[in-house]
Amino acid sequence: MNSIAILVARILLALLFLVSAVRQTIYRRGVEQEMAAHGMIYTPFLLGCAILIELTGGLSLILGYATLWGVLELITFTLASTFIYYRRLLDRDQLNHALKNLAIIGGLLMIAAVGPGTFGIDGAMAAR
């Protein structure tokens, strides 16, 4: 049961990042404009990096492969995104989004702490 719960947690967390990467790819121009509005420069390059991070981190979680590296990648990305996009914490909406991101980081830290479980490439290799 424990490994099933870990697998479900990995999939649910990964979906967030994978869907985001797909949406950012589809709506690339709008996302670049939003990034520029937040004071970011080199937005095409940075958006490409963000999409790559979300895809590789998300796939790492789903496959349970190089899970710790994928989790650390996603934690760093989520923390940076939180500081860039949610600076006005006295605004209720911004505070709520920042707290949600911190909760996501908490879930990722749990995966880092307990590992990918047995349903994943890392778990299968460790069982050998």
Task: List where the protein language model places each region.
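Extended, low-polarity transmembrane helix blocks
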Residues: 1-30, 36, 41-56, 62-128
